[in-house]
Amino acid sequence: MSNFHEQAMHFVYQQVLHRLLGFFSRPERIALQLLVQRILVAAGGLERIGSYRVMVVHEGGKECAYTLAFLRAAQLSIAGRTPETFTLRIAVLRQPRVTTKVMARIQTQCNELFVYDDPTVELLLVDETQVRRLDKHIPVAFERLGSDMDRTQILMAGHLSEGVPRATFFYADLLSRAKLYRRACEWGGHVDALIDRRPPEHLGEYSQWIKQVALKQGHAPNALFTQGFESAVKLCSKLDDDFKHWLRLPVPLNLLGTTSADTEINIINVFDCLSYEVDMLHSQVLMFVEGSWNIKILDIEEPQAAVVLLSAHVQGVRGVCQCGDEYHVGVQEFLRKASADNQTNERYKSQVIKQLGGSFNTPRRIEKLRHSITHYLDELHGMTDEHLVCALYSPFVDQASGLEAFLRQRYPAKLYAQNDLRLALMEENAASEADVKWLESISGLPVSSLRVLFGMSKTDFTAGKSLIAALWMHDPNKLL
């Protein structure tokens, strides 16, 4: 790059910074100064900042967009006072919940912040097979991600847990995320620091949780148990393999490096900078990078909203199936309780919960919500309400002990065939093609997975013997 071009790009980036700072409130400007100082101290001063690499994980939500805007402002602020600044690695972890729409939002944010073509920014798309530079001109990056394996894990977990939302939707996602994070760290140059926007105690709780589960699963104590966050991530990767082995699913080829566990990444916690006293929902900075939006307009693809609404949806469907209630009764009860539990909490997720409770407070609005959530689950996992209802009844585990009750309640016309269906679950040669197709249709699972469930037991959350039960038993957030 010529000296003239460098000067021109420096001018452009300072114009970007000037425009971005115009959206910062006074408290946000103070928070930005604190963030800059924190990064400089972690790097060892201005003289070392040019060789310092900071990584942030982007999961598609507004918290991530807000954090990214601050980091970009910090990066450009340092560039304005010294010839060099830190390298910012933005890792987009490609999981099914990062939909085409979410990816398009990330692209909008990157355009507004001028991160494309900036040599001090590494924008990565990370999936199970590869890590690649994210380019706005590569359309494949924004195609829908296939999720057959993901759907199978979620539905099997749903059957084993009788549809407990956190055990059904969250644990498989958590375990698989560890490998994506490690791939993002191992790509290219060494990562010096990870940005963490959650409360300071969060990573400690995460590390302790994963280590407790690993011990429960029989992993012998070694160096990984005595160190910090990076070691916990490596244990989490092992648990992801355990989870797939347990469900008798194929374990992807391990493409990760074999670096030693003592290469801990520095954690730069920015919770007090970005989350403590700032009302993110009304921030002009967020409006700028995200575009105009309104939380009252349903945005189920917002991660914090999706977690709440999926749990509410499961409670609504469970009430219909097992108690004879109308759908809106269970949903409204869940949202009302969640809003009350978060009444005095002003963190972003709590703000979202309270706004959701206020927005979906009539049967008509909740029925519209149901259609949106059903569409969302179908887009993410190819999961229908029929599949979810089947998981809630869990009719195939414990050698199909609940099959008769399930058929009597949901498919009385199929009661005559229960013995044939049971045989289809027991052995391949005894199954008719029609029975197999029907079982796969109502469950969303291949018959091979249904036969695995046939030989498994429902999760006893108090005993902690299975992997799901161990995750639940030690989960610090299972009641949140």
Task: Enumerate the language-model features and the residues they cover.
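Nucleotide-activated chemistry modules centered on ATP-dependent adenylation/adenylyltransferase
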Residues: 1-51, 87-111, 117-480
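A phosphate-binding catalytic loop at a beta-strand-loop-alpha-helix junction
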Residues: 46-80, 285
